[in-house]
Amino acid sequence: MDEAYEQEVVSADEALQRDDFEVAFRHLERAHVLAQRMTGRHTFIHWRMLLAGLHRGDFREAVGQVPRIVASILFSRLWVPRGNSGRARVSAFKSMPVPADLRHLVP
């Protein structure tokens, strides 16, 4: 899982450098699914989503990440909605389908 997570983060960074926000958020969402049970990584992805939202000028996304950052610190090890993308426009309590190519990596 570490390799898959790292690849998603690198791919998100590359897309952000090109200002390709759709691709960047897709990779951040996939990294989020992989990191949900790991407090540090989970929090890092929400931080990156906040920064990406600011860079894009999407203040709803950026502001929506603030409570998710707090929740990731407090609840990552207790409960997370499996497959949730982590985006501000999705309920933080909604379980979502895990992408098929990640299913074998997500507990």
Predicted regions and their residues:
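TPR repeat positional signature
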Residues: 8, 46-49
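Alpha-solenoid helical repeat scaffolds
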Residues: 42-47, 80-82
